[in-house]
Amino acid sequence: MSDNLWALARAFIITVVFMPFLIKFLKQSKEQAVIRKLGPDHQSKAGTPSMGGLLFVLAAAISAFIGGAAYHGMSGVVAMIIPVFALVAYAIIGGIDDALKLINHADDGFAFKPKLLAQTLSAVVIMLIMWLLGVPFTLYIPMIGTINLGLFYFVFLWFWLVGWSNATNLTDGLDGLLAGNSVVVYAAYTVIAMHMHNHIIVLFNFSIIGGLLGFLIFNRPKAKIFMGDTGSLALGAGLAIESILLGVPFSLIWFGLIFVIETLSVIIQTVGYHFWHKRIFPMAPIHHSFEKFGWSEWQIDLLFWIVSSILAVAGIFYMN
């Protein structure tokens, strides 16, 4: 357990120590978030730096590799490549998205097709690494069993990575909301990984949780910095790949139900407006609807965190 706590501490310390410097640098370079004018009044947040995910992702990656090398040798470093690559690759995609938004001073960054291409290429590389490391292309489906997908495994891998990275991206709309929920979901998978004796995923998760806890010090309401797409895409990709590596991908639908609800609210809102020219919710993603009802960011955060925690505890008891 001590090696895991050291992993958490390393990522936490790196994030807490260097985040003030990143905030100062981003403010001086005027790399600040562009706040959408639609929906709840968030214009008071204009000028808040974005791309905070850059630091906690980097801190988590460094801590994870150090932990893998220190306690498992070269085999630990090699095994850590898959989850860390997924985390970093999608952070880079999100970083490009954030950078383009800042350069263009607009809410739209990476165009849809280039962004999807980048996500697809990342999935190809991840699958290639998995093949080189001998990870079986099998999928466990509840009530059916384990099936060998062969090359069709790529389709599932791509869908899972793109789907969950975008789901967490949609959830990142309030100070502390995604970071707090991600801590809970990663903690749940840490318990699952411990039960499966998967020490690599445990180390990886402790590293991410450490980085996120450090980030929350600066991201809680009223946030001094946002994680941006750099962090939100990375967190979803990290959860997607580790659920696959643990052999329980569909459990993420339960543990990440908050992310699913957020995504469904956007889909339902879009379909409703397209076909009936009516909005089903006051605003989507659904966390903004709570704002419309007069809830504060802290109240919404706490509600979502509590729901995630209940789901996590129930899921852990069921799986164990």
From Swiss-Prot:
It catalyses: UDP-N-acetyl-alpha-D-muramoyl-L-alanyl-gamma-D-glutamyl-L-lysyl-D-alanyl-D-alanine + di-trans,octa-cis-undecaprenyl phosphate = Mur2Ac(oyl-L-Ala-gamma-D-Glu-L-Lys-D-Ala-D-Ala)-di-trans,octa-cis-undecaprenyl diphosphate + UMP. The chain crosses the membrane at residues 5-25, 51-71, 76-96, 124-144, 145-165, 176-196, 198-218, 233-255, 298-318. It is an enzyme of class 2 (transferase). PROSITE patterns: MRAY_1, MRAY_2. It comes from the Bacteria. Pfam families: Glycos_transf_4, MraY_sig1. GO terms for biological process: cell division; cell wall organization; peptidoglycan biosynthetic process; regulation of cell shape. Its cofactor is Mg(2+). Its main location: membrane. Its EC number is 2.7.8.13. InterPro entries: Glycosyl_transferase_4, PNAcMuramoyl-5peptid_Trfase, PNAcMuramoyl-5peptid_Trfase_CS. It is found in: Cell membrane. GO terms for cellular component: plasma membrane. It is a multi-pass membrane protein. The keyword Chaperone does not apply. Keywords: Cell cycle, Cell division, Cell membrane, Cell shape, Cell wall biogenesis/degradation, Magnesium, Membrane, Metal-binding, Peptidoglycan synthesis, Transferase, Transmembrane, Transmembrane helix. Pathway: Cell wall biogenesis; peptidoglycan biosynthesis. Disulfide bonds: none annotated. One of its GO terms (molecular function) is metal ion binding. Catalyzes the initial step of the lipid cycle reactions in the biosynthesis of the cell wall peptidoglycan: transfers peptidoglycan precursor phospho-MurNAc-pentapeptide from UDP-MurNAc-pentapeptide onto the lipid carrier undecaprenyl phosphate, yielding undecaprenyl-pyrophosphoryl-MurNAc-pentapeptide, known as lipid I. Belongs to the glycosyltransferase 4 family. MraY subfamily. NCBIfam families: mraY. This is Phospho-N-acetylmuramoyl-pentapeptide-transferase. It comes from Leuconostoc citreum (strain KM20). The lineage of its organism: Bacteria, Bacillati, Bacillota, Bacilli, Lactobacillales. The gene is mraY.
